[in-house]
Amino acid sequence: MRTLWILAVLLLGVKGNLLQFEMMINKMAGRSGIRWYSDYGCYCGKGGHGQPQDATDRCCFVHDCCYGKVSGCDPKMAFYKYSSDKNDIVCGGNNPCLKEICECDRAAAICFRDNLSTYDNKYWNVPSETCQVESEPC
């Protein structure tokens, strides 16, 4: 019960797309994005700088780059349309910007699923100085 309360409190600050992204990660990777990816490596959860620490962190790097290419709407606040079945997510709707955000989130959720074996607890809450080297270009 305490865990549900904590999760509810965390989700109060999550708006729009970030909540949808959390749901996609749960669907595709079978785990909570907030719990597993909110403070991982140099790119998962904190914006990002430096070199991705492993394949899982690279999923977040690519996701950040994808969001950086979106124009015309706010990736972290916009609601998009999508449907899901057993093994996939399909982005829908008529708004190209919203569909682009959805595709960014979809690709990251699939990347997390495909790289579950690379997740390493040593990259959880890495010191900020680890991520101070120059970032590679998107």
Swiss-Prot record:
Its EC number is 3.1.1.4. Disulfide bonds join 42-131, 44-60, 59-111, 65-138, 66-104, 73-97, 91-102. Belongs to the phospholipase A2 family. Group II subfamily. D49 sub-subfamily. GO terms for molecular function: calcium ion binding; calcium-dependent phospholipase A2 activity; phospholipid binding; toxin activity. InterPro entries: PLipase_A2, PLipase_A2_Asp_AS, PLipase_A2_dom, PLipase_A2_dom_sf, PLipase_A2_His_AS. Binds 1 Ca(2+) ion. Residues 1-16 form the signal peptide. This is Acidic phospholipase A2 Tbo-E6.
